[in-house]
Amino acid sequence: MTKNLPRPDVIITHESDLDGLVSGILLQRLAKALFNTDVRLEAYHYHGWRQRDLRESAGWVADLAFEPRMDRPNWAVIDHHATETLPKNATLIHNLEKSAGLLCYELCQLHGLTSPALDRLVHLNNISDIFLEDDPDFVIACDYANLVKTYGFWNLHALVNGQLEKLLDHALLEVMAVKRRIEDPIGLAWSRENVTEISPTVGFVDTVIGNNNLIVHQLLEQNITRFPVLITLFRRTSGMTIASLRSRNGEALKVAEKLQGGGHANASGATLPRSVKTNQDAINYLRQVLNPRREISEFNSLESVFDALEKERG
């Protein structure tokens, strides 16, 4: 399978989660083994990725959905998101039922790039990213995933100096465990009383503490709200606001795409405009984008009022 991989000028991965971190670092190791070269790693959120030109003549992309602009000679995509694009020029390694990290690790295994520590880490990443909630390791797997959500992609990358194995049993996992035991129940109790309607099918969940993804998962699992899609916000130090969308029956991705985002059917994300500074800004923006018919209806009603006034004046 790796015989079809071109020599990359760049490796690009998803910045938002552990799967992107695992995928990117594993592909760097694979490139070193195949071509004896150190290939630079870049990571993007969905909005930044869509704005990036593919200026290199060759590259590898992981954990970002395959789309027509990526169908280029000497490009390879290793991913697990749904896509309607079939490759004609690029190499596509794709499986909806495996995380991107697992797909990359399977390529590494073909060249002996394995270890018990990596076996364990890739396994936990796969559980958290695919959200295999019935797996006995699900809780600890979510603690690992929360490391990237809490500390950020590049901070963790620097902390372990690109050596994934150092994440296994890292001391910071004790922090994640404490946060899960103490913060999550408090956060869930507060958030369940603070859900705002965005549209008839989308609710905004305000959060103050705890793991947003697990809180929303419980809200959906327990049918606490009437909305099939729930949105939470995460603000990065750069000022960007990331919207995280969750559902149980595949509705989240369709909503994310309306926001120029992407992801999985039940777990997606989107970057909101930089003009969004507060939760109320976000609510106003989301309502505007996700309720176009309501806006048209209101506009038509207003137009009718003006028409009536004109007739009275006439």
Q: What do these predicted regions represent?
A:
Residues 126-195:
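Hydrophobic, aromatic-enriched interface-forming segments
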